[in-house]
Design a protein with these regions (language model features):
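Short, solvent-exposed polar/charged micro-motifs at secondary-structure junctions
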Residues: 38-41, 229-232, 275-277
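A short C-terminal helix-loop "cap" of Rossmann-like NAD(P)-dependent dehydrogenase/epimerase domains
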Residues: 125-126, 181-191
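Actinobacteria-biased recognition of intrinsically disordered, low-complexity terminal regions
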Residues: 264-284
């Protein structure tokens, strides 16, 4: 098992906890910055050197920014990290997934996806920036990516099952850092008791999507309680926009352009950031 992390110290801390419960599992920490496509390619190259099948890939990274920020490659930070980084990593590791007797990809989204109006790949520079709107768009992009990858998985020429999951409203670093309003609500006793669940419970839908034998291609898992905020992990419905196959196909095409990663095995050159729905940029 490899933990791909941006912060080595936190990664090593997580690895110690893994080894405490699974001491015989070969495990390691490797550095990855999903906001830098060169870092994504470097990790994929290192992993290919092992020449071993990959049985499970969990696309779990997520960032939130209250102000407009950019990735190394010039994309809006949240869609660039939360979606494009995962899209590129999964595509570059696809041959290793296909080489496994049975492999699974789990894309972690958020309840925020249901509030998004677009998948948020890029934005108009002159438009007011709304951090929550951009975050929600990146999480919708996660679901559209998972759904489209599930449809395209047979073309990978392997037994690869793709599913998605969300943690409900879990008490995590990401949630408490989304501004004083949400942070105060999360730490309030009433919210902690009635609405918010702990990190372990929040991880349950992801674990079910990753390990349950009855997972079907395109499944989506989340808490089964009211509003999917908390509760036991169950199969849940995708938000309406996440079921839009034309939107998913358009996002896929633009993601290939923006990352330079072609899942059919033909590398392309990144064309740089552009808003979804705009004409692709070209060069002469």
């Amino acid at each position: 098992m490899a933990l791909a992390v941006r912060d080595r110290e936190r990664g090593e801390s997580a690895l110690e906890r893994v080894r405490a419960v699974a001491p015989r599992t070969p495990s390691s920490v490797t550095l990855l910055d999903l906001a830098d496509l060169a870092s994504v390619r470097a990790l994929a190259a290192r992993e290919r050197e092992y020449a071993l099948p990959l049985g499970l890939l969990v696309c779990n990274a997520g960032v939130y920014a209250g102000s407009r920020q950019r990735t190394v490659d010039g994309h809006e930070l949240m869609v660039g990290t939360n979606h494009l980084g995962h899209f590129a990593l999964t595509g570059l590791l696809a041959p290793r997934l296909a080489a496994a007797p049975s492999a699974r990809v789990v894309v972690v989204s958020s309840l925020a996806a249901a509030t998004a109006g677009t998948p948020g790949l890029g934005e108009q520079e002159d438009a007011p920036f709304r951090g929550w709107r951009a975050y929600a768009g990146s999480k919708l992009a996660n679901l559209l990516f998972a759904a489209e990858l599930a449809r395209r998985a047979p073309a990978l020429r392997g037994d690869v099952t793709v599913a998605a999951a969300h943690p409900g409203w879990a008490r995590t670093r990401l949630l408490t850092r989304r501004g004083p309003g949400l942070g105060s609500l999360v730490t309030a006793p009433a919210a902690a008791t009635l609405l918010v669940q702990g990190p372990d419970a929040g991880a349950a839908p992801v674990l079910r999507a990753a390990t349950a034998p009855d997972v079907r291609p395109g499944d989506y898992y989340g808490p089964g309680g009211p509003g999917q905020l908390r509760g036991a992990a169950v199969r849940v419905e995708l938000p309406p926009l996440a079921r839009d196959e034309a939107l998913a196909a358009a996002l896929w095409h633009r993601s290939e352009q923006e990352t330079g990663v072609d899942y059919r095995g033909r590398g392309t050159s990144p064309v740089g950031p552009a808003a979804l729905g705009a004409e692709p940029t070209t060069s002469s």
